[in-house]
Amino acid sequence: DKESARLHFGLDPDTITLLVTGGSLGAKRINETIEHSRRVLSAAGIQVLHIMGGRSELPEVHEKDYVRIAYCDRMDLAILASSFAVSRAGSSTVSEFSAVGLPAAYVPYPVGNGEQKLNVADVVSGEGGLIVADAEFTEAYVSNTLVPLISNSRALAAMANSAKKVGVADGTARLLALVKGVL
């Protein structure tokens, strides 16, 4: 359950939890913005599970309302523990979050052909997530957009419900049915 998952990371079992991840290598903008927003998040009663990635130079931290680790081998528990997420917009991440109804602010990787924007299009249009450009993911964005949203239990629940409606929780069964249909 959510409470046990939070305890696994040393977090309070009853506090709203923000999951932050930029993927296995990390995301400099996301890491720096969250680092500089720690006080604002804490003051709003939001605890943070920050998975910074392997290339980050930030140290690991284990505080009452802020846990920052380089790598997480239990993403299932990290996702379960969370009320909201901030993340890059890789297809697997978007699929995993939406399948379980985890609303998120997606910060697509700013380099490439724009595929990460496409990955979140359905979730964003279905109101299960937000999209924010890398350059716009700032302390002001966290203070003015994320904190009010995450602090609003009604809006958060609606967003979680919308994310789950867009998500596909039975992808494995669908793929097996497709394979069986071909055989």
Predicted regions mapped to residue ranges:
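Donor-nucleotide binding loops and adjacent catalytic segments primarily
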Residues: 3-7, 11-87, 94, 117-121, ...
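A short, well-ordered alpha-helix in the C-terminal region of glycosyltransferases
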Residues: 7, 155-169
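Conserved donor-binding loops in enzymes that form glycosidic bonds
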Residues: 22-24, 165, 178
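Conserved donor-binding/catalytic loop of nucleotide-activated donor transferases
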Residues: 80-82, 98-107, 126
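Short hydrophobic beta-strand element within catalytic cores of glycosyltransferases
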Residues: 87, 103-113
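Short acidic/histidine- and often glycine-rich active-site loop of Leloir-type glycosyltransferases
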Residues: 96-99, 114-126
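A short acidic/histidine/glycine-rich donor-binding loop in glycosyltransferase catalytic cores
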Residues: 104, 122-135, 147-148
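C-terminal alpha-helical cap of glycosyltransferases
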Residues: 148, 168-183
